[in-house]
Amino acid sequence: MRHFLPSLYTEAEPADIVMETAKGTYIGKFDRSNYDNSKPAEQQPIWSIKLVATPNDHTIQTLYPNGIKNPIFVWDQKESYQYKFALS
């Protein structure tokens, strides 16, 4: 299995996600409940992100009460994932 964000990812727990924005830092976790270990990482469904803390601003919780859906994944030439977030 190719590792997703090796510095943040572990086999046992979802990856912690840190988003730096103008309004503060948002902490989230991947929901990996639909992860299929029989498939390579690039064939996995898009994972949702559940926000678990918004220390500086609560606007994002109001706009996205169930977390941010459908982050945009980029498969780069080094076969590692990078990610971008669509907040609008």
What are these regions (language model features)?
Residues 1-88:
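Viral virion structural and adsorption modules
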